[in-house]
């Protein structure tokens, strides 16, 4: 049993270490050019439509959450009267 387990471990180790790596294109230089460009756009919106949507969703959730928290604090500060 132990011999089979050790053999399986060696096979798995060999498979992982000898598998070919995927080659990805290095996009860092082009992203650096995009984000360092002086075009008047805020850096948090330079990524395109996805960044703009993420920014707006974050803004809406933050404002909505703050308003809801203030509402709940106001409700909690004026308890219902008991008859």
From Swiss-Prot:
It comes from the Eukaryota. The keyword Kinase does not apply. GO terms for biological process: mitochondrial electron transport, cytochrome c to oxygen; mitochondrial respirasome assembly. It holds the Pfam family COX7a. The modification N6-acetyllysine is found at residue 33. The chain crosses the membrane at residues 49-77. One of its GO terms (cellular component) is mitochondrial inner membrane. Residues 1-23 form a transit peptide. Keywords: Acetylation, Membrane, Mitochondrion, Mitochondrion inner membrane, Oxidoreductase, Transit peptide, Transmembrane, Transmembrane helix. Residues 24-48 are mitochondrial matrix. InterPro entries: COX7a (IPR039297), Cyt_c_oxidase_su7a_sf (IPR036539), Cytc_oxidase_su7a_met (IPR003177). It is a single-pass membrane protein. One of its GO terms (molecular function) is oxidoreductase activity. Residues 78-83 are mitochondrial intermembrane. Its main location: mitochondrion. Component of the cytochrome c oxidase (complex IV, CIV), a multisubunit enzyme composed of 14 subunits. The complex is composed of a catalytic core of 3 subunits MT-CO1, MT-CO2 and MT-CO3, encoded in the mitochondrial DNA, and 11 supernumerary subunits COX4I1 (or COX4I2), COX5A, COX5B, COX6A2 (or COX6A1), COX6B1 (or COX6B2), COX6C, COX7A1 (or COX7A2), COX7B, COX7C, COX8B and NDUFA4, which are encoded in the nuclear genome. This is Cytochrome c oxidase subunit 7A2, mitochondrial.
